[in-house]
Regions:
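A short, well-ordered alpha-helix in the C-terminal region of glycosyltransferases
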Residues: 217-226
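Short acidic/histidine- and often glycine-rich active-site loop of Leloir-type glycosyltransferases
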Residues: 169, 181-196
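Acidic donor-binding loop of glycosyltransferase active sites
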Residues: 150-162, 175-176
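Conserved acidic donor-binding segment of nucleotide-sugar-dependent glycosyltransferases
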Residues: 191-202, 210-215
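Acidic anion/phosphate-binding donor-loop and adjacent secondary structure
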Residues: 21-27, 63-83, 147
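Conserved catalytic-core segment of nucleotide-activated headgroup transferases in glycan assembly
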Residues: 56-57, 69-133, 139
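Membrane-proximal helix-turn-helix segments that form the acceptor-binding/catalytic region
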Residues: 26-43
């Protein structure tokens, strides 16, 4: 809003990292955020989904940049044991990351596979009652994240808004990203290099169990992700 009133400039740009109206309930704050897309700025967006939204829904002139990862940290390694293990990007303080949905999905998967191990990272979840065995890493360094991905057969990363950097990092570490379906994801991930799931705990659990039962399918996706 300040930039809209600032006129001593040749051009005005808007760095759009996510669809910020989705950060709020559909009320005043949602409208305030959405209105910023109608102020005539030129958009620079994180990824193609946001570029298309800005162009098609708001008439904004917009260009995008693609995602990447730090190849000095996220490197392909082989999992060193046969223990079934999954990673979940757990962010209960960030509603758009679907913490509750992911927890329900993993709980259902654990019921089907009682020997499953789960690694949480993204936030400290020690105050939550979690019925299955898990490691609570909390907020960690990129190197700890990379080491965690390598240990896991699959990494569950759910998002209701723009895709995070995690799927690329997971693939770079020779693990398999399990991502929620939608145009906000499929501009970068697809059913060749990732596992795409609905926003349904039972469907997520069934899908992940199926890949555990068919490791050759999982290996194919892992290879294409690299």
């Amino acid at each position: 809003y300040y930039v809209r009133r600032f006129n001593n400039t040749i051009s005005k740009f808007y760095f759009v990292q996510d669809f910020e109206p989705y950060f709020y309930a559909h009320g005043s704050e949602y409208e305030f955020a959405e209105n910023t897309y109608k102020m005539g700025f030129r958009g620079i967006t994180a990824g193609d989904w946001l570029k298309d939204v800005m162009r098609n829904d708001y008439g904004m002139t917009a260009d995008s940049f693609l995602f990447s990862y730090d190849d000095k940290i996220y490197k392909p390694k082989e999992k060193t044991d046969d223990k079934p293990r999954v990673f979940f990007y757990a962010r209960p303080v960030t509603p758009r990351r679907d913490f509750e949905l992911g927890m329900l999905a993993i709980n259902e998967l654990w019921k089907k596979m009682p020997d499953l191990e789960v690694i949480f990272a993204g936030w400290d979840v020690s105050n939550y009652e979690i019925p299955f065995p898990h490691q609570n890493l909390g907020t960690v360094t990129p190197q700890v994240l990379a080491d965690s991905y390598v240990k896991c057969d699959m990494c569950l990363i759910i998002s209701n808004t723009n895709l995070s950097l995690l799927p690329l990092e997971v693939m770079a570490c020779n693990s398999v990203a399990v991502c929620s379906k939608g145009e906000n994801s499929t501009w970068l991930v697809n059913e060749e290099n990732s596992i795409l799931v609905d926003y349904d705990p039972n469907q997520i659990a069934d899908t992940m169990e199926d890949y555990f039962k068919h490791p050759e399918k999982l290996a194919s996706i892992r290879k294409k992700g690299l």
